[in-house]
From Swiss-Prot:
Entry-linked SUPFAM superfamilies: Homing endonucleases (SSF55608)
Organism, as annotated: Thermoanaerobacter sp. (strain X514)
Role of this protein: Involved in cell division and chromosome segregation.
Any one GO molecular function term: DNA binding
Keywords, comma-separated and alphabetical: Cell cycle, Cell division, DNA-binding
Record-linked InterPro entries: Homing_endonucl, Sporu_reg_WhiA_N_dom, Sporulation_regulator_WhiA, Sporulation_regulator_WhiA_C, WhiA_LAGLIDADG_dom
Record's signal peptide: none
DNA-binding region(s) from the entry: 281-314
Alphabetical list of HAMAP family matching this protein: HTH_type_WhiA
Family: Belongs to the WhiA family.
Protein name from the UniProt record: Probable cell division protein WhiA
Gene Ontology BP annotations: cell division; regulation of sporulation
Record-linked Pfam families: HTH_WhiA, LAGLIDADG_WhiA, WhiA_N
Length: 318
């Protein structure tokens, strides 16, 4: 199973205790996996469709507990290449469908006409628990989260822009920074920062998923730090080797053209050590001098030797 599926299975096992939270979570599920059918004779039906059996059981229980009815259920296998199972929860009775939609503030009657509310009615977000329940339902119905080993990305898909904006506003009320974009015929509310995704998982109650993601984040950060250290050390080693080769080349040129006695005693001493010990660092070379010289002092002398070699080459060209 994917990280996203595991997260949904964990969330579907959380059952809200307060009626306000049950209503809020059901409202979000209707917005994301529900469809309302309106017929010419004034009849209305409500259908939920999901490929997650845990989510289907949650919808069934919420309707049963809130409205005291047993909704119809159906399992359907996909055709052609997609053989996955779909679970349908069906409320065919107009009166009950209207009661459910009215309770979650999606359906209103104005002057004898039915009016659909596409945004999130603030009346169902009565407290912090209800807000969290709504976000949990929105994730169960239309949410997904990428495998944190590959990328940090969490999104909620909705069919309506007004709902998408309200959902983003609800998420951001928890000091987060979600954004809304259009994707084909849908709207996507998304977050891309690891810390913010962790916060959302905490808000909706996915604590096991949160711990797994945090463990992966820590591992990735440690791995990146190790890689940075290795790359830095490799770069420094390469730089040191190149400098050593350049210094030895300069010393050999002086030796072959005018001899090392051409150099002042302090430079000659360093030159001989560098040729005899090409792998030593500047610090180690300095410790072998009499008296010992610091790293910067050795570096200064070797630069002087390179300058002398350069001048000798220029004279030869002239």
């Amino acid at each position: 199973m994917s990280f996203s599926s595991d997260t949904k299975d964990e969330l579907a096992r959380i059952y809200p205790e307060e009626e306000e939270s049950k209503i809020a979570e059901l409202a979000a599920l209707i917005r994301t996996i529900g469809s309302i059918s309106m017929y010419g004779n004034g009849k209305i039906s409500l259908t939920f469709t999901t490929e997650n059996a845990s989510v289907a059981r949650l919808v069934f229980k919420l309707i049963k507990d809130l409205f005291g009815i047993i909704p119809e259920t159906m399992v359907r296998r996909g055709r052609y290449l997609k053989k996955t199972l779909s679970y349908l929860i069906f409320v065919p009775d107009t009166k009950i469908a209207e009661e459910i939609l009215g309770k979650v503030k999606i359906l209103n009657y104005e002057k004898g006409h039915i009016k659909l509310n596409y945004g999130i009615d603030q009346k169902i977000l009565k407290n912090s628990k209800a807000k969290k329940a709504y976000l949990r339902g929105a994730f169960l119905g239309g949410g997904s989260i990428s495998d944190p080993e590959k990328a940090y990305h969490m999104e909620f898909i909705t069919h309506n822009l007004e709902h998408g904006k309200d959902l983003s506003k609800l998420i951001n009320s928890f000091d987060l920074n979600s954004k809304v974009i259009a994707r084909k015929n849908n709207y996507v509310v998304y977050l891309k920062e690891g810390e913010q995704i962790v916060d959302v998982l905490n808000i909706i109650g996915a604590h096991s998923a949160l711990l797994n993601l945090e463990n992966i984040r820590v591992y990735k950060e440690m791995r990146n730090n190790v890689n940075r250290i290795v790359n830095c050390e490799t770069a420094n080693l390469t730089k040191t080797i190149n400098a050593s080769l350049r210094q030895i080349e300069s010393i050999n040129y002086i030796k072959e053209t005018v001899g090392l006695d051409y150099l002042p005693p302090n430079l000659k001493e360093v030159a001989e050590l560098r040729i005899n010990y090409p792998d030593l660092s500047l610090k180690e070379l300095g410790q072998m001098l009499v008296p010992p010289v610091g790293k910067s002092g050795v570096n200064h002398r070797l630069r002087k030797i390179e300058e002398i070699s350069k001048k000798l080459k220029e004279r030869r060209v002239q």
